[in-house]
Regions:
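Glycine-rich, N-terminal phosphate-binding loop of Rossmann-like dinucleotide-binding domains
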Residues: 13, 60-62, 83, 208-210, ...
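Active-site regions of enzymes building and remodeling cell-envelope glycoconjugates
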Residues: 28-33, 99, 188-196, 280-281
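Phosphate-binding beta-alpha-beta segment of Rossmann-like dinucleotide-binding domains, i.e.
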Residues: 97-99, 105-153, 165-168, 172, ...
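Rossmann-like adenosine-cofactor binding region
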Residues: 51, 66-70, 176, 182-274
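An N-terminal-biased, well-structured beta-alpha scaffold segment characteristic
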Residues: 2-100, 201, 221-223
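Short, Asp-centered acidic motifs that coordinate Mg2+ and/or phosphate
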Residues: 56-57, 78, 205, 233, ...
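Rossmann-like dinucleotide-binding domain for NAD(H)/NADP(H)
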Residues: 97, 101, 231-328
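Glycine-rich Rossmann-fold phosphate-binding loop(s) that bind the pyrophosphate
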Residues: 14, 159-160
């Protein structure tokens, strides 16, 4: 089969230096890989690139894969997410058109859990604060209140693989752990399943792991942030829009919250100036999921899903039920 005849896989964007792992898997299976810009392009540009390349498979990291993009390639059979969340993919349109949508749910739960606990320790041990102080020429140990993690109540909002891993790590520190999940939580040693209001009212630190969808957008709004203990810490490593940013800014400015650590924002990569102005805010650029090991697994497994579908097999991690798929 000539290069021109091989089915094409289009990778919309990627948060790493190259696409060699993806290329090895895709082209090693006899398909053609075409890469878009590494930085996520606007929806219109992605739609034009899909129209141009007519891919049978799409791999996407952060770029929007809209209904128009999905409808622009009659050959399309799979949209594979290089990640867990599906909020940048028009899943309903893919389903309607008989196209698989996949993700990689297992690859980074340890890293995200590590990141969330690391952010909590940055507050309880004053790591970021004292680093800034020493670099500014100030050696003043009494400028921040430090806390013993074992004495704290930590609430986890969202209790999937990442939430469970976070709970296990917090148990290791001896903290009391509360968890809120929209599904019924089975009894689990070291974890108390409670309602969201109770969790917010009792927790000294709240860690957010819940996925973003229509029901969870602004789940932590002005009313619910007001339920939190005065001086509590809020850590978000899920999706920025789970928290109402303006309400969060107000809670920080008023002193109701003791601090916020955010790996995600509502409109990445734009950072609201009011967040930058708060000394008790820690920001990282959506990298909680990354490590050498997790990125290798992500890229390999996502690419293998595309190959599986293009070979006529069902994916291992399908996240929809494509219309008419049984007839193919």
């Amino acid at each position: 089969m000539s290069t021109a005849e091989r089915p094409t896989v289009f990778i919309t964007d990627y948060a790493w230096p190259d696409v060699e792992i993806e290329r090895a898997v895709i082209e090693g299976a006899g398909f053609k890989l075409v890469a878009g810009p590494s930085t996520p392009a606007p929806a219109a540009e992605i739609e034009a690139l899909v129209e141009q390349h007519q891919p049978a498979g799409i791999l996407t990291n952060w770029a929007p894969v809209t209904a128009k993009a999905i409808g622009s390639s009659p050959a399309l059979r799979i949209v594979g997410r290089l990640g867990v969340g599906l909020d940048n993919i028009a899943v309903d349109e893919a389903t309607r058109r008989g196209i698989w949508v996949t993700n990689v749910p297992d690859y980074c739960f340890e890293e995200v859990a590590d990141h969330s606990v690391g952010m909590l320790l940055a507050f309880t041990r004053g790591l970021v604060h004292f680093d800034r102080e020493v670099r500014a020429g100030r050696w003043e140990p009494a400028t921040a209140r430090l806390l013993r993690l074992k004495t704290l109540t930590c609430g986890i909002v969202g209790y999937g693989r990442i939430g469970r891993s976070t709970a296990q790590k917090l148990n290791g520190f001896g903290a009391r752990v509360l968890a809120y999940t929209r599904s019924s939580g089975a009894a689990e040693k070291g974890v108390e399943f409670v309602g969201l209001e109770q969790l917010l009212r009792e927790s000294d630190a709240v860690i957010v792991h819940i996925p973003l969808n229509a029901e969870t957008k602004h789940l932590l709004n002005r009313e619910r942030l007001a339920w939190m203990k005065r001086g509590a810490f809020l850590i978000n490593v899920s999706r920025g829009a789970v928290i109402d940013t303006q309400a969060l800014i107000e809670a920080l400015q008023s002193g109701r919250l003791g601090g916020a650590a955010l790996d995600v924002l509502e409109n990445e990569p734009t950072v609201p100036p009011a967040l930058l102005a708060q000394p008790n805010v820690i920001l990282t650029p959506h990298i909680a999921f990354t490590s050498d090991a997790s990125l290798r697994e992500l890229r390999q497994w996502a690419s293998e899903e595309v190959v599986r579908v293009l070979r006529g097999q069902p994916p291992k991690e399908g996240r929809n039920k494509p219309a008419g798929i049984a007839a193919r």
